[in-house]
Structures are given as C-alpha cells and as structure tokens.
Regions:
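Short hydrophobic/Thr-rich beta-strand motif most characteristic of the beta2 strand and flanking loop
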Residues: 26-33, 41
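Conserved acidic segment of CheY-like receiver
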Residues: 2-13, 18-22, 50
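Active-site beta3 strand of CheY-like receiver
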Residues: 45-51
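Receiver (REC) domain active-site loop signature in two-component systems and cognate sites
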Residues: 56
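C-terminal output helix
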Residues: 107-116
Length: 122
C-alpha cells in the first residue's frame, strides 16, 4: 500500500469521495469524523498527510491543525484544508495554523488528487 492519508470530514459522502479518489490512486486512507476523532486515531497511527474539513462539530479543522502541529513528529506533516470557506481571512487563518494547502468545496476529485500528489507523492 502507498502512503497513508487521513481524511477528516463530518460528511460521510465527502469521506467516501476522498476514500475512493485517494485509494484509487494508491494511497491508504484512514477516515475520521471530526478533529477529536482524528487526534484519537493519530495517537495510534502514523500517517503521511491529512486532508481535513474546516467546519466540523467537536473540533474544527483549525484547532485540529494547531493540535497536530504541537506533536514534534507531525510538525511538518502536509495538511490540506478542504472546505466551503473561500474568504481570504479564513485562508490566512488556516495558513497561520499550519495548513499546507487549501481546496474549496465543491471540488473535482482530479483537482484534489493533483494537489495531494504534488504535496505527498504516493
């Protein structure tokens, strides 16, 4: 199996699209339903990259990134924000938290895959 990508989104439909797109390109995908679930799984699983939604219950994407960046082993792990938010202020907030990239929903799977391959080749 290829590199491991954690797909974090409260929408089962979006997680399914991420799973199909990334697994079809040779990535191993680990799913999480929100930031807290992602941190719990990250404590027991090593991953190479994360794709996360911004607006989620329990812990949003910004707080998730901030928490991930506290761990020395994940300080430089690529993290892509996948969100409906397109305002420049939100992008700056994401970048300040440590996001490596930003994709606005709705998105084409090919667009996501191009960004993932550029940041974290399988």
């Amino acid at each position: 199996m290829g590199k491991r990508v954690m797909a974090v989104d409260d929408s089962a439909t979006v997680r399914q699209v991420l799973q199909m797109t990334l697994a079809g390109a040779g990535y191993e995908v680990i799913e999480a339903v929100d930031g807290k679930d992602a941190l719990s799984k990250l404590a027991n699983t090593s991953i190479d990259m994360m794709v996360t939604d911004l607006n989620m219950p329990n812990m949003d994407g910004i707080d998730l990134i901030k928490n991930v960046r506290l761990s020395p082993g994940n300080r430089f792990m690529p993290i892509i924000m996948l969100t409906t938010e397109s305002q420049p202020e939100k992008k700056l907030e994401g970048k300040a938290a440590g996001a490596s990239g930003w994709i606005v929903k709705p998105f084409k799977p090919e667009q996501l895959l191009a960004v993932v391959r550029m940041i974290c080749p399988a």
